[in-house]
């Protein structure tokens, strides 16, 4: 299974330019005869890879576009790949569903479970009990007037911004050099 969650110019430190970066990611795909390729269509570069007709055995997923094979919409996973418009309600999840990376990881986990015919109850149990990575969008304090989040795991602008999505009245403290 190959997965492309996102492509961002923040990742260009290892590549000469965006074209080389996209080519490197494409090389991950189609490495095996029965390989399945899970590709987010939420950013322009990943979407471009998904639309490439040379890429086979692909499933699109999205937290923004309901046209994807598997998408997130109104607290539900909407499955249009394995089923026709099946909705799976996400209940009792300890992860912050306002963060795009958590939602993307949940969608990918769902696709992998369906692909390997793992019963949905194990998927639900796993995401219900998953606590997330240390220091990644860790809620320190939550009250009516304040929400304090430690996201020191964020290593670039994109990962920092994903934590701030859907938040209001933000006071951002940054450190490091």
List the predicted regions and their residue ranges.
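Flexible active-site lid/hinge loop adjacent to a nucleotide/diphosphate
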Residues: 1-60, 71-74, 90-97
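Short, acidic/turn-prone active-site loops that include or flank metal/cofactor-
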Residues: 7-10, 62-66, 154, 175-177
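Short secondary-structure boundary/capping segments
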Residues: 28-30, 50, 68-69, 137-140, ...
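Beta-strand->loop->alpha-helix junctions that form or flank phosphate-binding loops
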Residues: 38, 55-73, 124-128, 138, ...
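Residues that form or immediately flank small-molecule/cofactor binding pockets and catalytic motifs
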Residues: 42, 63-66, 132, 142
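Acidic-glycine-rich active-site phosphate/pyrophosphate-binding loop
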Residues: 70-91, 138-141
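Nucleotide phosphate-binding/pyrophosphate-handling subdomain across enzymes
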Residues: 90-177
